[in-house]
Swiss-Prot record:
<dbReference type="Pfam" id="PF01113">
    <property type="entry name" value="DapB_N"/>
</dbReference>
<feature type="binding site">
    <location>
        <begin position="11"/>
        <end position="12"/>
    </location>
    <ligand>
        <name>NAD(+)</name>
    </ligand>
</feature>
<comment type="pathway">
    <text>Carbohydrate degradation; glycolysis; pyruvate from D-glyceraldehyde 3-phosphate: step 1/5.</text>
</comment>
<keyword id="KW-0521">NADP</keyword>
<keyword id="KW-0324">Glycolysis</keyword>
<comment type="subunit">
    <text>Homotetramer.</text>
</comment>
<dbReference type="InterPro" id="IPR006436">
    <property type="entry name" value="Glyceraldehyde-3-P_DH_2_arc"/>
</dbReference>
<dbReference type="InterPro" id="IPR020830">
    <property type="entry name" value="GlycerAld_3-P_DH_AS"/>
</dbReference>
<protein>
    <recommendedName>
        <fullName>Glyceraldehyde-3-phosphate dehydrogenase</fullName>
        <ecNumber>1.2.1.59</ecNumber>
    </recommendedName>
</protein>
<dbReference type="InterPro" id="IPR020828">
    <property type="entry name" value="GlycerAld_3-P_DH_NAD(P)-bd"/>
</dbReference>
<dbReference type="GO" id="GO:0006096">
    <property type="term" value="P:glycolytic process"/>
</dbReference>
<feature type="binding site">
    <location>
        <begin position="194"/>
        <end position="195"/>
    </location>
    <ligand>
        <name>D-glyceraldehyde 3-phosphate</name>
    </ligand>
</feature>
<keyword id="KW-0963">Cytoplasm</keyword>
<feature type="binding site">
    <location>
        <position position="168"/>
    </location>
    <ligand>
        <name>NAD(+)</name>
    </ligand>
</feature>
<dbReference type="InterPro" id="IPR020831">
    <property type="entry name" value="GlycerAld/Erythrose_P_DH"/>
</dbReference>
<keyword id="KW-0520">NAD</keyword>
<dbReference type="GO" id="GO:0005737">
    <property type="term" value="C:cytoplasm"/>
</dbReference>
């Protein structure tokens, strides 16, 4: 069984730690925190070894009564691979430390593709990361795009994609971000970064995206228009998405007409933190007009890319060469539909 270090135990890191702990071929070597907050205390209560990201702050953990097992460098000595879930831009700075330690590393979508050199999605380009030293799991939004566009491309080919990304203003825990009472083009230039990010894993796809921030914390929402290579009916698209794992069709007619109601449904699934790893697509929105497909989907930004981090671990360490075998193994352990 391989040991996985989680550098950064925040929104993504704590979810990746629990996902790794749920697998039968890997375990958590330890998790790291910069400060002795409630998340650090919960990590200890869950049985994870806790390490300090900033050595000078180790004394603060002791004063707070939170035991630590050493520094991040000590944690890396106990691990076969590290998942870097530190804030945007910090991961790229950590890359040199991982190189010096000779340890493979997986980064999150907040890091630039060029800084890491390779990006990852379980469905689109798993093979490219087999045996690699470093890879980057694409962002929550890009993961959402890939989850639905890849099966559509496999079914009938894609000429061109245009997508409007309606992004949440902040995560639920982020009290210092917004907007509170505005709609913000983010960025105000076209295209947004999401299209180029998708191209790092779906090579050659013709896509342009625009994005805006809105005053909500629950989910992102995508409005997607796809010019298709081959003619298909809307029902064929529905059937393909319905059979695609990590995607779910939801119906407004059944009370799932908004992101709020979708997250209420996620609560009913009984998962930790009410996570929704799957990408919900509104079935009523799926329509084909003159060879162009239209559909709407939502993305739970805190959790949708978490299973991809588990698959990336298997790819880098060559624990599983077949992407679908890894996907299904991860799904079973995490209860993903």
């Amino acid at each position: 069984m391989i040991s996985v270090a989680i550098n950064g135990y925040g929104t993504i890191g704590k979810r990746v730690a629990d996902a790794v702990a749920a697998q039968d071929d890997m375990k958590v070597a330890g998790v790291s925190k910069t400060k002795p907050d409630f998340e650090a205390r919960v990590a200890i209560e869950k049985g994870y070894d806790l390490y300090v990201s900033i050595p000078e702050r180790e004394k603060l953990f002791g004063e707070a009564g939170i035991p630590v097992s050493g520094t991040v460098e000590d944690m890396l000595e106990e691990a076969d691979i590290v998942v870097d879930a530190t804030p945007e831009g910090i991961g790229a700075k950590n890359l040199e430390m991982y190189r010096e330690k000779g340890i493979k590393a997986i980064f999150q979508g907040g890091e630039k593709h060029d800084a890491i050199g390779l990006s990852f999605n379980s469905f689109a380009n798993y093979d490219e990361s087999l045996g690699a030293d470093y890879t980057r799991v694409v962002s929550c939004n890009t993961t959402g795009l890939c989850r639905t566009l890849k099966p559509i491309d496999d079914l009938c080919g894609i000429k061109k994609v245009r997508a409007v990304m309606v992004r949440r203003g902040a995560d639920p825990v982020q009290v210092k971000k917004g907007p509170i009472n505005a709609i913000v083009p983010n960025p105000p230039t076209v295209p947004s970064h999401h299209g180029p990010d998708l191209k790092t894993v779906m090579k050659g796809v013709n896509i342009h995206t625009v994005a805006l921030l809105v005053p909500t914390t629950l989910m992102h929402q995508h409005n997607i228009m796809v010019e298709l290579e081959d003619p298909v009916e809307a029902d064929e698209i529905k059937a393909r998405l319905d059979e695609t794992t990590r995607v779910m069709l939801v119906r407004a007619s059944e009370g799932l007409a908004s992101t709020a109601e979708i997250m209420e449904y996620a609560k009913e699934l009984g998962r930790s933190r009410n996570d929704l790893f799957e990408i919900p697509v509104w079935e009523e929105s799926i329509n084909v007009v003159d060879g162009e497909l239209f559909y709407m989907q939502a993305v739970h930004q805190e959790s949708d890319a978490v299973p991809e981090s588990v698959d990336a671990i298997r790819a880098l360490l060559e624990l599983e060469e077949d992407n679908m075998k890894s996907i299904m193994k991860t799904n079973r352990a995490m209860g993903i539909l």
